[in-house]
Every structure is written in C-alpha cells, then in structure tokens.
Design a protein with these regions (language model features):
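A short beta-loop-alpha structural element at the N-terminal edge
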Residues: 2-17
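Conserved GNAT acetyl-CoA-binding A-motif
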Residues: 96-108
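Conserved acetyl-CoA-binding loop-helix of GNAT-fold acetyltransferases
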Residues: 83-96, 114, 118
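Conserved GNAT-family N-acetyltransferase fold
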Residues: 53, 65, 70, 75, ...
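Conserved catalytic-core motifs of GNAT/GCN5-like acyltransferases
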Residues: 104-106, 122-139
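Conserved GNAT-fold acetyl-CoA-binding loop/helix
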Residues: 17-43
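Conserved beta-hairpin
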Residues: 51-63
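A short, internal acetyl-CoA/4′-phosphopantetheine-binding micro-motif in the GNAT/acyltransferase core
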Residues: 71-82, 106
C-alpha cells in the first residue's frame, strides 16, 4: 500500500496541476473558463484553509485529499491512477484518523457520487449553487455506514 503523507504550501503547485488534470478528466460539465476560475480560487484560498494529505508514486503526488474539520472538501486522483484504490485509501484514512463524516460533491459528478455511495455516504442536503456562487448544485453527503 502507498504511504499517505501530510502536504503543505511547498506542494501547492503540484497539487494544482494534479487538480486540473483530475477535473479535466472527471468534470465534463465545467467549461474551460470555469476550470480557470476555480483553479485560481483553489490556489489563492482553498488549499491554505485545508489539512492536506497525499500519496506519491515515483516521487510524484498522484492523489490528495483536503479536510476541514470532519468534512472532505476535496479528493483528487491523477487520471492514470484512478480505479486503483488510492481514493478509497485516502477516504479510509480520513475516516479513521480524522473522524470524517461528511463530504460535498457536485451533483453532476456522478462518478464521485457512486464512489462515495459505495463507501457508505448518503445525500442529506442539496444546494443550488457551489461555494463560488455558480449554478453547479452541490450535494452534502453523510457517512451512514462505515464499511
């Protein structure tokens, strides 16, 4: 199993590049312009407000998770490493070590919804707009069944 390590500001550039690769592969509902807007927000604000952990392969970060209290704020895996258990390992780590119980997911991101449902999370709330005020509905999910 890959080792999960804490990440900090020295990793932000690499995390932003990984975020963009992952979002481009999984968030087909976002325009290129929106991706650029979110990239700036994440780089300037979001990363600094989160507790970050990641996994490396051959020295490169291939997956990371961002936590705030007991909420998963972001989870991204390099497209070449998706469906290999990295995301599950990061979520399991967050649940075990940080007692994570919730996650927010774009409603249009059906892959992520299925992923979290399979890990025991279920929707309990819905917001019409995301944190940036854009019309990308957000579903709040709570951990119902610890697997």
């Amino acid at each position: 199993m890959k080792t999960i390590m804490a990440l900090d500001e020295e990793n932000y550039k690499e995390l932003l590049a990984l975020w963009e690769l992952s979002v481009t592969a999984t968030h087909d509902f976002l325009s290129k312009e929106d991706i650029q807007v979110y990239r700036e927000l994440i780089g300037e604000t979001y990363l600094q407000s989160l507790t970050l952990f990641g996994m490396r392969v051959n020295g490169k970060i291939v997956g990371f998770i961002g936590l705030k209290d007991q909420l998963i704020q972001m989870l991204f895996v390099h497209p070449n490493y998706m469906r290999m258990g990295l995301g599950k390992a990061l979520v399991d780590f967050a649940i075990k070590e940080y007692n994570v119980t919730e996650v927010d997911v774009n409603e249009q991101n059906t892959q992520a919804l299925k992923f979290y449902n399979n890990l025991g999370f279920e929707a309990f709330d819905r917001f019409e707009k995301d944190d940036a005020g854009k019309l990308y509905p957000i579903l709040s999910l709570a951990l119902i069944n610890k697997s």
